[in-house]
């Protein structure tokens, strides 16, 4: 919950078996996320086992492709605020706070996980 509004995090997954659990656990400990949705887009074997060890809800999207996975996650999400994050370690859960800080003032807030300032990723 962020300022009285629910927060859903959507994580499309394909080859993130090794990082998915740590990513989900970091969102769980953040304390503001009401719903974690993992969109299994033909993910590597064992990914579902890692997801099952968390509070996340896993949904399957059989049509291959990032766009299909994102759309499926958006359809499934029930939060007032929706965050799309990559579960490969390039998006840190704490960066969601930086995005949500602007949510009251704008209809859409974007962050880049690839922007580099001082050699490090910043949102």
State each model region's role.
Residues 62-64, 68-75, 81, 93-123:
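Acceptor/aglycone-binding surface of glycosyltransferases and processive sugar-polymer synthases
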Residues 15-29:
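Short, well-formed alpha-helical segments that are part of the catalytic scaffolds
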Residues 6-8, 35:
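Cell-envelope/extracellular polymer assembly enzymes that use nucleotide-activated donors
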Residues 16-19, 43, 66:
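Donor nucleotide-sugar binding loop of glycosyltransferases
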């Amino acid at each position: 919950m962020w300022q009285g509004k629910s927060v859903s995090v959507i994580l499309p997954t394909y080859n993130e078996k090794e990082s998915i659990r740590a990513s989900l656990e970091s969102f769980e400990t953040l304390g503001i996320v009401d719903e974690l949705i993992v969109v299994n887009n033909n993910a590597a074997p064992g990914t579902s086992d890692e997801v099952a060890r968390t509070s996340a809800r896993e949904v399957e999207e059989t049509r291959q492709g990032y766009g299909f996975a994102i759309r499926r996650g958006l359809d499934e999400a029930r939060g007032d605020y929706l965050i799309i994050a990559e579960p490969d370690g390039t998006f840190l859960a704490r960066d969601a706070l930086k995005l949500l800080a602007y949510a009251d003032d704008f209809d859409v807030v974007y962050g880049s996980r690839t922007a580099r300032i001082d050699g490090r990723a910043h949102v």
